[in-house]
Swiss-Prot record:
It holds the Pfam family RIIa. Tetramer, composed of 2 regulatory (R) and 2 catalytic (C) subunits. In the presence of cAMP it dissociates into 2 active monomeric C subunits and an R dimer. This is cAMP-dependent protein kinase regulatory subunit. 3',5'-cyclic AMP 2 binds at residues 350-466. Belongs to the cAMP-dependent kinase regulatory chain family.
């Protein structure tokens, strides 16, 4: 998102244009409108993410809240019964604590018995609670700060000591029959599921990778070839690809050293600069690769186990890229691209019928191409595979025997005739100045421009011929 300075500059320009009499009211109206636009955009992104199975803003459903309340009542009642029967709390099954990091006690120390006295049990199971009144909300358990929070943060805690008395709003826990003790640092630093980190794209404007280092022209040339072969980097724009290359970290690996091990969690993607590596699956050699090759791609997408063991068969020089850096670069580039193309697309008349959600999907599918003055973008008679929007620049449209028939500029589009009618290109389009175009492939054209196709057909210059 735009930085605060950009927002102030936009506001300043608006003030200079409108010259409002009531400045404060104008400012209030302006920023209220900007906030509404931003919130609308964020919610549309949430809908788009949900359609792809990604949850941007996790929440607790009503069903989960009811289940949690029931579990809490049952838990409190069983503790109270145990207390009244004279059974010590140590005889009750221990609870596994996998709670939010915002509660008073850490989740990774050990299994801890939750000692609730009969007073707290009775309070928890009171009729008011049972009837659903004042039930724990979404933040009551996760962000609960009780009297225990007065303890010093850096105070030493015996991991085997019993847990202090919980507050009345403690988060309900799952009971485990005959639990096995966990190591003290169990899962404290690593994820065990196939997942990705949560990132905020609006915080990436001024971010620079920790291992960022400008590479020499020779290194850039070699790494571009290696990166270009990999499907993960094919759709990156030139700036993002350059950032990836300059974020690669050089690693020297001696002969015989194990680089990655089958079954381990993957954190890095590797490019072989020099040397040879061998791949083993279940201790069986399956492949060998040398300079220019790469491996470990899935580590950039998911925190997934390694599919093979890789060993350096000679002394090797590798370039490594960690998953978090790649995801930041990819997300930051995609977010900026979506913002940029949303502004472009909503100003193109034929796309007025698209919703913000549809424009966002269209923006994700667009690729960028550059043409210098005199270069041909499409040629008459060729097979049509792409639809084009001009982001900036100028181009001439010409036909054989007729010469230049029209000129195109920013916001204009071309290439739709061949896609609509499955015909060869009906004209040649040549850049007359440096021109940047956004292109949409044939499959994306048919899939994403459904509401617009009818408008394009009405504006088809060859329509009278069919």
């Amino acid at each position: 998102m735009a930085t605060y300075q950009t927002e102030l500059d936009l506001f300043k320009n608006e003030v200079e244009q409108k010259q409002p009499n009531d400045f404060l009211q104008f400012a209030a109206n302006y920023f209220t409108k900007r906030l509404e636009q931003q919130r609308t955009f964020v919610r549309n992104q949430e809908s788009l993410a949900l359609s792809k199975g990604i949850v941007l803003f996790p929440s607790t459903s009503k069903h989960d809240s009811v289940a949690a309340s029931s579990a809490s009542l049952s838990h409190g009642s069983s503790k109270a019964n145990a207390s009244q029967s004279g059974i010590s709390s140590s005889g009750v099954d221990e609870d596994v604590l996998f709670k939010s990091p915002f509660v008073d006690r850490g989740p990774h120390s050990t299994h801890i018995v939750d000692h609730l006295d009969s007073t707290h049990s009775n309070t928890t199971a009171s009729p008011a609670k049972a009837s659903g009144g004042d039930a724990p909300g979404i933040f009551k358990g996760n962000f609960n700060v009780g009297t225990e929070s007065q303890r010093k943060v850096n105070s030493s805690v015996d991991p085997m000591a019993p847990e202090p008395t919980a507050t009345t709003h403690s988060f309900p826990r799952r009971s485990v029959v005959n639990p096995k003790p966990l190591p003290i640092n169990f899962n404290a630093q690593r994820r065990t599921s196939v997942s990705g980190e949560t990132l905020q794209p609006d915080h990436l404007d001024d971010w620079k990778p920790e291992n960022f280092q400008e590479k020499s022209p020779e290194q850039v040339s070699r790494l571009e070839k290696a990166v270009g072969k990999n499907f993960l980097f094919n759709k990156l724009d030139s700036d993002s690809k350059k950032l990836v290359i300059n974020s690669l970290e050089e690693k020297s690996i001696p002969q015989g050293k194990e680089i990655i091990k089958q079954g381990d969690e993957g954190d890095y993607f590797y490019i072989v600069e020099d040397g040879t590596v061998e791949f083993y699956v279940n201790n069986q050699k399956v492949n060998t690769s040398g300079p220019g090759s790469s491996f470990g791609e899935l580590a950039l997408m998911y925190n997934s186990p390694r599919a093979a063991t890789v060993i350096a068969s000679t002394d090797c020089i590798l370039w490594a890229l960690d998953r978090l850096t790649f995801r930041r670069i990819l997300l930051g580039g995609s977010f900026k691209k979506r913002i940029l193309y949303d502004d472009l697309l909503k100003n193109i008349p034929i796309l007025k019928s698209l919703s913000t959600y549809d424009r966002a999907k269209l923006a994700d599918a667009l690729d960028t191409e550059y043409y210098e003055a005199g270069q041909t973008i499409i040629k008459e008679g060729d097979t049509g595979e792409n639809f084009y929007f001009i982001e900036y620049g100028e181009a001439d449209v010409s036909q054989e025997g007729k010469g230049v028939i029209t000129k195109l500029g920013k916001g204009d589009y071309f290439g739709e005739v061949a896609l609509l009618n499955d015909l060869p290109r009906q004209a040649t389009v040549t850049a007359t100045a440096r021109t940047k175009v956004a292109t949409l492939g044939k499959s994306g054209f048919q899939r994403l421009l459904g509401p617009v196709v009818d408008v394009l057909k009405l504006n088809d210059p060859t329509r009278s011929k069919h």
